[in-house]
Amino acid sequence: MYEEIFNQIRSAANKRNLKDSTIHAYCTSVAHFLNHTAKDIDALTTDDVDIFLTEKKLSGISPETYNHYHSGIRFFYKKILKMNWDDDDIPRMKRDRKLPAVLTKAEISAILDATPNLKHKAMIATMYSGGLRVSEVTHLHYDDISRTNKTIHIRDGKSRSDRYTLLADRTLEILTEYWFQCGRPRGILFPSSWTGDYLTKDSVIQFFRESAERAGIQKHVSTHCLRHSFASHLFESGCDIKYIQALLGHRDPKSTEIYLHVSNKTLLGIKSPFDEMGGE
């Protein structure tokens, strides 16, 4: 019904090197908006957006969902319709800056011990070792692991920029065992056993949840807790926030400062917290 509009959005978004997932989200948001207004494109005004977003807010949706709608419709109005858009008149919804859940080192060890599948264990260890997002660990390739430099190369992450992060000795040991016992993959590091393609995010989230339950973790945890724990444990060891920001791939310092404070160390000699777990 709106295919021509979606094609215009895709074209404009591709020129700006936006990710496919972002483009899909924009099209979905615009489709919801257009279905709600039921107006001809030429008759749309910013008042229509205000009414739509106000109704969404009153329905009790989360700030994240509200802002997804906002971003997609804003892009549509500014880049496709070439209409003025005042962020003061149609603001984004402020999010609660909640402290993220952080796992202790003992809890992470327990989760690893409760993970019988070697591939799953290697993925959990890798996420904690370098603070990886689920989408980043699923898209790792064999060549992204540097045994010499003890680094993990994250390609085309969420911010559309490459970075390097830490590879713990303990993680390398687990990865080596996994590699030799699970087919010695030379392309995708953690391929699906069924398709040979990238694992889905949902499958990783599911097996991590099952491992946490087997480990007896009582708090509500997610795979993202490994990333938060990586950053928090680095900070506790004295690592400067700007280096943690770089390792996480955060462009906005506020994304890191939600759970960290400034310290005084340099990147030289920084160890992954996985290498400092000892007997905890």
Model-flagged regions — what are they?
Residues 1-280:
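Conserved catalytic core of the tyrosine transesterase superfamily
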